[in-house]
Amino acid sequence: MKREEIKVSVLRVGGTNCDAETKRAFEELGVQAEILHANELVRRGNLLEYHVLVFPGGFSYGDYVRAGAIWAKWIMAKLGEELKAFVNENRFTLGICNGFQVLVEAGFLPGFDGVSPYPEAVLATNFPPGYNCRWIHLKHENRGKCAFTWKIPHGKVLRLPVAHSEGRFMFAKEKEKEFLKRLCDNDQLVFRYCDRNGEYAEGRFPTNPNGSFYDIAGICNPEGNIFGLMPHPERAFYWWQQPDWTRQKQMLQYGDGKLIFESIIEYLVEKF
Amino acid sequence: MSISLYIRRKTFPLFEVNVLGASDQQLLEISRELGVGLNLQEMNRVQEFFRRKGRNPTDVELQTIGQTWSEHCFHKTFKGVIKFDGEEIDSLFRTYIAKATNDLKPRWCFSIFEDNAGIIRFDKSYGVAVKVETHNHPSAVEPFGGAATGVGGVIRDVLGVWADPIACMDVLGFGPLNFDYEKLPPGVKHPKYVYMGVVAGIGSYGNNMGIPTVNGAIYFDESYVGNVVVYCGCVGLLPLKKFRRNAKPEDIIVLAGGRTGCDGIHGVTFASAVLTEKSEEVSRPAVQIANPIEEEKLKRAIIRIRDLELASAITDLGGGGLSSAVGETAKRFGCGAVVELDKVPLKYPGLAPWEIYVSESQERMLLAVPPENLQKVLEVFRSEDVEANAIGKYISDEVLKVYYQGEKVAEIEIPFLFEPPKVVRTAEYKSKVFEEPTFEEPKNLTDTLLQLLASPNIASKESVVRTYDHEVKGNTLLKPLQGESAGPNDAAVLKPLDDSWKGLAISCGMNPNYGKIDTYWMAASAIDEAIRNNVAVGGRRIALLDNFTWGSPEKPEVLSSLVRACKACYDFATAFKTPFISGKDSLYNESPLGTVTPTLLITALGIIPDVRLVVSMDVKEVGDLIYVVGRTYNELGGSEYYRLKGFVGNTVPKVRAKEALKIFKAITRAIDLGLVKACHDLSEGGLGVAAAEMAFAGGYGMELYLQKVPVENLNRNDFVLFSESNSRFLVEVSEKAKEEFEALLRGLAYSEIGKIAKTPSLCVYGLSGDVVVDASLNDLLACWKRTFSSEV
């Protein structure tokens, strides 16, 4: 498939607010990206025209109950069947921050046995509590399953910003061990919070900014075509978005966030 | 209510108010009972007007007049006459603020003092709109809601000139967080409660709307215990050719956004009154309820309508609700308006017509739409899930007609509505003399520096800043916090356009403590600080905003301090060639604990031609030279150092504009030539604090020699280190750029005062060559971070 043929839909509803910069990141890499109101997608009924579907960051519908829960219920009610078909056709879905919360609430992630009718995990209130906007480090854990990171070397440390108040990834206590094993066995673990040297945070704040179980920052489904993460790759795309660019002697062309967008595009280019 | 004064007119709640037959005393009673806040002179004008009409006003009419003539909406004090020092000042606004801009006549000003936000040119096609609001009164009564709606309101001000909001900034003032509960008068909330609520409210609105909060400050003062200070600012971007302001008769009035309810009734009269013990009970309904997601949707729809060029005018609904938005639009375009109140969608039934007309429910905008575009406009709103309704139209007669259930409930001529009697006030200046402190110079200043770093006005506000999303939209190029240690950058820089390297620098300046001595030099210092913060990162072509928080202008002494601050605004805006482009005043900040310390916030907006040259404040490389630029004077009055010692003092820092302007230009030039590796302005805590911040932000130590600092009339280490003289910078320059840099500064006060050291500590040698400060970066940083590490 040619790069310029790739079509990305960046979805939005009331309260979505990271759509423009997400679209910009895709466009910078030469693919077609379009911001689409979810109402419009329902009206058009053309989801399958797109290769990549993105749930961007924001506060969908105000997140007045658990973050992402309202949009998740909305999307399953209005587009559930189409979305399942989209996933089953091996198209690609990305959830960033609020989008990750939506994918978890909708049962797409971790999706151990396909789309779950109820959430199998949760992105709970941060610990320590409160909204937190800062740059953190992530270690790439995936061994090649995730289409959004397959180009990133295993073990590479990336630097991206987080900005959320509900990002603590958790399983139900009694299933923690079992589910973690499945995540690892299925190669669903994608990013874990670590320090700049790649040492895992082990839950320590602020290296792990939200108290996530096992320092989990991002996971994919068993097939590797649905990926969600709390940090914002679209805010770490250009060199000048990095917090310490004024200290760099040699300007890098891009930030680490680009690796994620590039991976999925190259996946499509090379494998389709 | 006294029956004889009010006659119920209809089956719905509409009252005729017996103004014609009322005595002066009864007029005041009416004003008080209806909560319209009009004084006798104004009530007499109303009486005279309705006598000519030969009928009594309805409550809708009286309320409309009350809202329009309120201090909040009409700025009576700034537009009135002030007798001061033998002269008569006809309008502070025209005489000082607007005059500075008119004298300078910058070509890059696009629309100034015309709408709710000022617009300047950013480049050939784009303009930048900016506005800073005060939301002190609501935040005192309900901190979370007051602050959140303050942010919501200022974002709508920017939307109200067709600009897409791209950044917010917030400057806050609180009482000391450890204020004694025993001393708290009834009705005044504890500073800590106010602090937590206000910070959460601001974060919640900005984050939910997806607008980065990029700049701000938090200041503590005893007088803020009873009068919290909440300044909310917003910057927006608009393609200038899409700017529409040409409403005409027959255009439809479209009300869009949230529904109208009982929240925010009489917000403006409340904001123009003194806070009392009863404010909670009486004024709680005056605070609106925030729903940022509604505004987010509204924003999307409005930007689409702008781009499709479907509407002829727009304004936001803020203070005074519909009554002021409709009236002001009609006035602006020289027409009248017909409004049908039953077309206004309500949150719940049961509102009286006057309540619908003056309610300040949030997240609402008012558009003027040519009839042929109405359906398209409504369709855009519908597609964004935003409610919108045609509620009336503009007409050629300059009269306002309001209907409810087919009955006319108000008819007032527009010119009358905008000609309230001119307020005449008297100002009287009494210069203040504080004890000039005499204390011995401490031998070792390490502890003093550590204490200063931990003092509330200097200590790190990281725990607050991180609760605001400063990265959303992905265009924040220089962030509020710099480096791993989160050092305080002087200004935020945005890169608003994808295909351009042009940047926007946003900074602020505020020095309430100097105002205790003299508001003239306080204003001058705030202007200098805002500008030098902007210059420090590479900003130029600077525009200013003024925001006043003052006490009751009816007190001659308070008023004189306002006049003096305004004079300084004129003097220094013209001297620095930095026009005012917008502003706002909040007066009557009085509580049972007394008058607020006069607090002038100056916001500066600069342009950076190429953001790749932007400079941050953290030191970069061992061996580089450290320069101080600007002279240090014996000016410690109002300084943080004196405060630490328990004094105010009299020697308030002055601004020497001619010298300052040369320094600013030289710094700008040096940045453009790439000679500056780090730059930090010297403000609270002076040289000592600035050096410490630069050092721990960069992770390298410094060795400095006070002997080399250019001073005048100073022979004490502590004064050289902590004086807060204006127009000074600390600059890092590499050895090889030394000559070129010094050539640029020739003739100015500057000196190479030391080096960046490998040892991670700040070492300062005193005037006689001995070590006066020797502190590890870890200790400096720990003290700076400790104060607010767990407040939020």
What does each model-found stretch correspond to?
Chain B
Residues 2-792:
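Glycine/proline-enriched, intrinsically flexible loops and inter-domain linkers
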